[in-house]
């Protein structure tokens, strides 16, 4: 009898713990992140690292990912979108740069455009998305001279937020 009562009490405790486990208090806010400032060079040489500078804030402090989508005429990318997760310390405010190594992209040719377009947005824990920032880049055949960065990216060390990794599938060679 004592065994039955003990087992019953144990089962009740387990069921009540499981019933409460499904309730999770969401800390996600209702306001989307805002990209307050952004900058990227618009010209450069093939093979150089393209740095995309962004400053963003989220009133709710729950930014979780930065999404980048690359477009280049004449190239069909296997994975045109890349996601970089925001570090916990940067979820309310972030300032830094994304790095895209153009060496791994398709070199411009007769069938591939020398112009790239990169679309960047930030999403928070609730799925709210910032407005998209669009950056255009054109291969010039040589690396660009280093130019001074605009504020606030010219102040001290700017941290790298992550590397944008894009995988390309190139058009087949012409048979003519």
PLM region spans:
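Proline/serine/threonine-rich low-complexity linkers at boundaries of modular beta-sandwich domains
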Residues: 19-34
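Short beta-strand segments of immunoglobulin-like
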Residues: 37-44
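Extracellular acidic, Ser/Thr/Pro-rich low-complexity tracts
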Residues: 55-61, 124
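Short glycine/proline/serine/threonine-rich loop/turn segments at secondary-structure transition edges
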Residues: 104-115
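Short beta-strand elements
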Residues: 128-174
């Amino acid at each position: 009898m004592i065994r039955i009562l003990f087992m019953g009490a144990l089962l009740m405790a387990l069921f009540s713990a499981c019933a409460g486990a499904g309730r999770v208090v969401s800390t996600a806010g209702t306001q989307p992140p805002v990209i307050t400032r952004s900058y990227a060079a618009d010209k450069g040489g093939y093979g150089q690292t393209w740095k995309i500078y962004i400053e963003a804030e989220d009133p709710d402090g729950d930014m979780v990912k930065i999404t980048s989508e690359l477009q280049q005429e004449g190239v069909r990318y296997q994975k045109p979108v890349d996601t970089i997760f925001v570090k916990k310390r940067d979820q309310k405010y972030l300032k830094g740069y994304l790095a895209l190594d153009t060496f791994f992209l398709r070199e411009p040719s007769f069938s591939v455009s020398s112009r790239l377009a990169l679309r960047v947005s930030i999403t928070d824990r609730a799925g709210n998305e910032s407005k998209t920032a669009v950056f255009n880049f054109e291969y010039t055949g040589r690396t660009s001279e280093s130019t001074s960065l605009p504020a606030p990216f010219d102040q001290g060390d700017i941290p790298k937020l992550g590397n944008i990794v894009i995988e390309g599938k190139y058009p087949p060679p012409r048979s003519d």
